[in-house]
Amino acid sequence: MYIRNGKGLWGDVAYSVDGQYLRYGKGLWGDVAYTVDGQYVRYGKGLWGDVAYTLDGEYIRRGKGLWGDVAYTLDGEHIRHGKGLWGSIVYTLD
C-alpha cells in the first residue's frame, strides 16, 4: 500500500492512502495533526520517549527498518521510506 506525498484538492499538503487523504492540519489544541476521514493522527511521544503518531490510541513509531532505513511501525508492520514508480517519495506499508 502506498502513502504518496502530494497535494489535496485545496492545495494543502496531503498523503494519500488508497485514494484517501491524510491531511496536514491543526488539531483541536493547536498540535500538528494528519486527518484520516476526519480522525486525527496526532504527533506526540511514545511510551519510551520516541516520536510517534497516534491513531485511535495505537502508535505509529519512528524507528529503523530491517535494512537500516527509517521506518514507522504500525502494529509491527513497517511503513518504509522509498521511491514510487514515477519518482515520487512514498511510504510503503507491508
Q: What are the functions of these language-model segments?
A:
Residues 1-94:
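Intrinsically disordered, low-complexity proline/glycine-rich segments
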